């Protein structure tokens, strides 16, 4: 994947996360979202955080959550965990739901 393709796809991930947080906040969720360059920080009511950031040199998107640190690469049309193969948005949904104590869904 070229650098341009990576940036286009990775920025789309960040935009989708932002849209998903907005949708969750339209419901019962209370998630604070802060963007600083290519880093998104999601802060939940209980003070826990999830950080999503881009890693251009490695062409990856990373998640840091209570469950640990996870690296995702674009493979066969989806961002996949480099160890487990889990899809990015499904994994982020699980991490956020666990940390928020309520269902919070993320999608592309």
UniProtKB/Swiss-Prot annotation:
Domain of life: Bacteria
GO molecular function, one term: ferrous iron binding
GO biological process assignments: iron-sulfur cluster assembly
SMART domains: Frataxin_Cyay
Keywords: Iron, Metal-binding
GO cellular component: cytosol
Keyword Coiled coil: no
Purpose of the protein: Involved in iron-sulfur (Fe-S) cluster assembly. May act as a regulator of Fe-S biogenesis.
Family, similarity comment: Belongs to the frataxin family.
Protein name: Iron-sulfur cluster assembly protein CyaY
Source organism of the structure: Burkholderia thailandensis (strain ATCC 700388 / DSM 13276 / CCUG 48851 / CIP 106301 / E264)
Gene behind the chain: cyaY
């Amino acid at each position: 994947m070229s650098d341009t393709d990576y940036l286009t796809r990775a920025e789309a991930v960040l935009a989708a996360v932002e849209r998903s947080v907005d949708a969750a906040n339209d419901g019962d969720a209370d998630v604070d979202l802060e963007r600083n360059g290519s880093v998104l920080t999601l802060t939940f009511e209980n003070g826990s955080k999830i950080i999503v950031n881009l890693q251009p040199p490695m062409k990856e998107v990373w998640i840091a959550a209570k469950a640990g640190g996870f690296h995702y690469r674009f493979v066969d049309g989806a961002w996949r965990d480099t160890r487990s193969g889990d899809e990015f948005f499904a994994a982020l949904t699980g991490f956020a739901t666990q940390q928020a104590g309520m269902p919070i869904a993320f999608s592309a």
